[in-house]
Swiss-Prot record:
Spans through the membrane: none
A Pfam family assignment: Urease_beta
Domain of life: Bacteria
GO molecular function terms attached to this record: urease activity
Name of this chain's protein: Urease subunit beta
HAMAP family assigned to the protein according to its UniProt record, in alphabetical order: Urease_beta (MF_01954)
Amino acid sequence: MKPGEYVLADAPVVCNRGREAVELSVTNRGDRPVQVGSHFHFAEANRALDFDRQAALGCRLDIPAGTAVRLEPGDETTVKLIPLGGDRVVYGFRDMVDGSLDPHEAAGLHAAPAAPAIPARHESAAGDAPSPLKERAGFDNETR
């Protein structure tokens, strides 16, 4: 082997093999492009994105690390999400979870977890946003 030489496998590398995935339709209802990175907690993505946030809770994009998905205003696409791995503890982002995604484990309980709920203050603002193809006076894309 020479310094800097690459030795490649015969078969392609399959990322996230065996991880259960969910597909969601996402629409950017805002007036600016939105980019979401590979390891961002997708349920906490920009409020101008219209999708089922409850279904995305605890998930990230099923794309290679360090990459992102970009949605232009008015774009509708389908994304594939996989569960966050590791300890499944989330801090930061939009401050929705700030702790374990599996509350029963954090509390040391063995009972089934209650269905996690997204606080109303974090629900999508997309329902309030106009179609980017139709301008409405007084619209701004700021969070409330």
